[in-house]
């Protein structure tokens, strides 16, 4: 294929998913202030799904404007518990508080992926996963965070289901790729439709 693909993310997890799928691509970081973009969206009543899609689109558009002719993949993930929105914890105490809030409850992961070329959106998709944590006591949360260390700070939920974080859960409703932040099957289907990959 002659179409250049660019992943608008420096996430090693998203890169690994695409590499494992046999996709050739480069990476570039978007130059956007995510918190500045999302604050007015939430104030105007946007849903967490909307916010994930708008942020993914902003990243894809930004990088596509700097990479003429390339098809750019933008991604974003939001986490909500009821009306409360969560971001990556900034330190271990914030991670501990998040896990205490999630304990025994079901939160929602909203993973958006957008394709853009030359500053124009080609395609958008949002997938949702419902994540039910088991009841966690403070001792277990402390031991879990001690075991995983700073990796807890690299994920919006302070966990990664591909590692010890899976032990936090009682039930998961949703696609694995949605949970790890890149709805891969819909993305691959669209890349085939756009003739970006063989198919």
Curated annotation (Swiss-Prot):
Site feature: Important for substrate specificity: 13, 77, 162
Record PANTHER family: BIFUNCTIONAL DTTP/UTP PYROPHOSPHATASE/METHYLTRANSFERASE PROTEIN-RELATED, BIFUNCTIONAL DTTP_UTP PYROPHOSPHATASE_METHYLTRANSFERASE PROTEIN-RELATED
Superkingdom assignment: Bacteria
Cellular compartment(s): Cytoplasm
Recorded family membership: Belongs to the Maf family. YceF subfamily.
Protein name from the UniProt record: 7-methyl-GTP pyrophosphatase
Gene assigned in the entry: maf-2
Top-level enzyme category: hydrolase
Chief subcellular location: cytoplasm
Gene Ontology, cellular component aspect: cytoplasm
Catalytic activity: N(7)-methyl-GTP + H2O = N(7)-methyl-GMP + diphosphate + H(+)
Function comment: Nucleoside triphosphate pyrophosphatase that hydrolyzes 7-methyl-GTP (m(7)GTP). May have a dual role in cell division arrest and in preventing the incorporation of modified nucleotides into cellular nucleic acids.
Gene Ontology molecular function, alphabetical: nucleoside triphosphate diphosphatase activity
